[in-house]
Design a protein with these regions (language model features):
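Structured core elements
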Residues: 70, 93, 116, 135-137, ...
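Active-site loop/helix belt of alpha/beta enzymes
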Residues: 140-286, 386-388
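General structural feature for long, well-ordered alpha-helical segments within catalytic domains
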Residues: 7, 23-26, 30-33, 56, ...
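A charged N-terminal "starter" segment
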Residues: 1-132, 136, 156, 167, ...
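Acidic/histidine-enriched ion/cofactor-binding microenvironments in catalytic or ligand-binding pockets
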Residues: 129, 205, 211-213, 237-240, ...
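Charged (often Lys/Glu-rich) extended helix/loop segments that serve as interaction or gating elements
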Residues: 32, 254-429
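Short acidic, glycine/serine/threonine-rich loops at helix termini
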Residues: 61, 84, 104-107, 126-130, ...
Length: 429
């Protein structure tokens, strides 16, 4: 638990429920862990980027910037948000499927942003926008993620140029006056450490083809445990393994390459929780099969954390307080949306199969906490569904102060992009 019951109640009193709470101290601890690469490679040879798609809130971007991290962005709008948080564009790498419009791309490049070409057509677009020194994302055939939906390498992935296209990448780049200075590869989120290590070796095998490359960006996807049968990736072990192969490459080639990584989940997942409230507890008994069905209905669900219904992700749930003498029970826990898939308790990687959560018997008004929701929850929230609106966010500072960093979305904000227009029926019904 990253916050005491007293703090959780204070957040609920401050902004209501549902609400996100982020613990600054925990986030800083996880940044320190990721800097194992810096301690192994040396500060001058390593860059830690934050994959801002994991959570793009301005206060959190500012925290990572103040901690000295650079940014991995996945859309032109993310570049805009990073700059809005006073992050220098020279610290931003843009890796996306579809590049921004040429005028916008040219403006970003002129002011120092680093463009990453993930498709052959990107090379022409970047050159037309005035790009010179570029990154290229290459799919070297290795893919590994916590689920098929989070695997971003291998034959089944659309991300990055395929490794057999390297000769064409080089030919086009030279013809366009582009200099490839960084190689990038990202194999997936929640990846297997052994596959990640193998991909590092494959990247170095191909580095000889790019004489101007000075940096290898090894991507992100470092596993952060959210469940008792999951294992957090050992960053120091990965760093030491990478260092050995980088040193061997230097001895063979004479090139001393820099290294970058761009974690998102690893840096912020553990540092966030979602605070909700129990509204109903229902019990049903199936006499034909002798099975009890308990359902706990809360005000947190898919509109605050879509990972559960998208991936079959598992997040621990606890009531506050955890133990007040009430009997234990097994219950399905669901959200408030008018959607059967809005469940908080599902089987591993299978959102279509529910599981029961063991907890003390909930009662109306209890606070409930969903853990490890710092990453890919707020940023992926389909809050327009059922017109629920956005949940607010609070930051717990190391000195114990609670700071509201986003307000609850209003009804007016739900419709602010809509045009008042009343179509005339075309059929007489």
């Amino acid at each position: 638990m990253i916050a005491t019951p007293k703090i959780i109640r204070a957040v609920a009193d401050l902004v209501g429920t549902p609400a996100y709470l982020y613990n600054q101290k925990v986030i800083e601890e996880d940044v320190y862990d990721a800097r194992a690469f810096e301690r192994v490679f040396g500060e001058e040879r390593f860059t830690l980027r934050y994959a801002m798609k994991a959570n793009s809130l301005e206060a959190l971007l500012r925290l990572f910037n103040n901690l000295g991290l650079h940014i991995d962005s996945s859309d032109g709008n993310e570049v805009w948000r990073a700059e809005r948080a006073d992050i220098e564009l020279s610290h931003v790498l843009l890796t996306c499927q579809i590049l921004p419009p040429q005028e916008e791309l040219a403006d970003y490049i002129t002011r120092g942003m680093n463009p990453n070409a993930g498709h052959l057509d990107h090379l022409e677009q970047i050159a037309a926008a005035g790009g010179k020194d570029i990154t290229v994302r290459i799919n070297f055939g290795e893919g590994s993620g916590g689920t098929p939906k989070t695997t971003t390498g291998g034959y089944g992935s659309s991300f990055g140029m395929w490794h057999t296209e390297i000769p064409e990448i080089l030919e086009r780049s030279r013809a366009l006056g582009l200099r490839v200075v960084r190689l990038h590869s990202h194999i997936g989120s929640g990846s297997d450490p052994q596959v990640w290590k193998r991909n590092v070796r494959i990247m170095l095998e191909h580095a000889d083809a790019f004489p101007d490359v000075h940096t290898l960006n090894l991507g992100g996807g470092f596993k952060r445990s959210r469940w008792h049968d999951e294992k957090t990736m050992d960053m120091e072990e990965c760093a030491r393994d990478a260092y050995e192969v980088f040193e061997a490459y230097q001895e063979r080639s004479g090139r001393r390459l820099r290294i970058e990584i761009e974690p998102g989940t690893y840096l912020i997942a553990r540092g966030g929780i979602l605070i909700g409230r129990v509204h109903h507890f229902r019990h049903k008994h199936d006499p034909d099969n002798g099975i009890d069905y308990n359902h706990t209905i809360t005000d947190i669900g898919m509109t605050e954390n879509a990972r559960v219904c998208m991936y079959g992700a598992r997040h621990h749930l606890t009531l506050v307080p955890e133990d007040d003498g009430r009997e234990m029970t097994s219950t399905f826990v669901v959200g408030p949306a008018c959607e059967s898939g809005d469940a908080l308790t599902v089987r591993k990687n299978d959102p279509n199969r529910l599981r029961r959560e063991r907890m003390r018997t909930p009662t109306r008004g209890d606070l409930i906490v969903q853990h490890d929701t710092g990453a890919y929850c707020d940023s992926m929230a389909p809050h327009d569904y059922n017109s629920h609106g956005e949940a607010p966010a609070v930051l717990l500072k190391p000195d114990g102060e609670l700071v509201v960093i986003t307000y609850r979305g209003t009804r007016e904000q739900l419709v602010q992009h809509e045009v008042k227009y009343s179509p005339t029926p075309s059929l007489a019904l």
